[in-house]
Amino acid sequence: MAVLSSRAMRAALGLAVLAVVIQLLRTWLSSKSYLFNQKDIAELAKQHAGMDFEVAFSKIIVELRKKHPGHILPDEDLQWIFVNAGGWMGSMCLLHASLTEYILLFGTAIDTGGHSGRYWADISDTVITGTFRQWKEGTTKSEVFYPGDTIVHVAGEATSVHWSGGTWMVEYGRGFIPSTMGFALADTIFSTQDFCTLFYTFRIYARCLLLETHTYLSELGLS
C-alpha cells in the first residue's frame, strides 16, 4: 500500500507540475509580441494567388525579406522537404521558424488527404494554386477552398483534409511550435522510416532558430 501511495503521490505531483507548465506557456503565448501577423501573410499570399506557383513563391519570399530583414532564410538554405503526417504526403519549404511562429510554403504534386492533426497552435493557409477540401469535426459536409482563399485551423481543432494534385499554399503558424513536431514527424518515424527526411526537418528548423538568435543578438549589438 505504501508503494502504491508513493506512486500515486508522484503521479499527482507530476500532473500538478505539468498543469503549472502548461498555464505558464499559455500566459506567455497570450502576452508576448509576435513578429508576423496572420492577416498580413494571408493578404500577401492572396496578391499572388492564381499565378504560376513558383513565380508566386519567389515574389512572396522577396516581399517577406523586405518587410522582415534577418528573419527569412537565405536562398542557399531553402529546401523542399517531404512531409508525411496523418496519412497524407506533401512537401514544405520552411522560410521562418522560432519557438512561437513559422512561415512555410506547402503543397503537393499529387492528390493526397488524411487527418489534419490537433495542434497547440493556430495555423492559416492561403491557396495559391489548386484546391483544398476540408471536412470539420462534428459536421457532415466538406468545404472546398480555391486560389486566394484562406483556411484558418484554430488550436485544438481537428479536420479531414484533402489537396488536389498541383495545390500550393502559403502557411503561417502561431503557438508553441515544438508541440506540432510530434504529429508532423510521427509517420516519418514509425511508418515511412525516412530518416533522411527526419534529419532534413530538424536541420532546417535548427537553421531557422540559429538565424533568429543571430538577428536578435545583432539587434542588441552583440554580434
From Swiss-Prot:
It comes from the Eukaryota. One of its GO terms (cellular component) is membrane. The chain crosses the membrane at residues 8-29. The record marks D125, E171 as: Important for ligand binding. Residues 1-7 are lumenal. Residues 176-223 are annotated as: C-terminal hydrophobic region. Sigma receptors are classified into two subtypes (Sigma-1 and Sigma-2) based on their different pharmacological profile. Belongs to the ERG2 family. This is Sigma non-opioid intracellular receptor 1. It comes from Taricha granulosa (Roughskin newt). The gene is SIGMAR1.
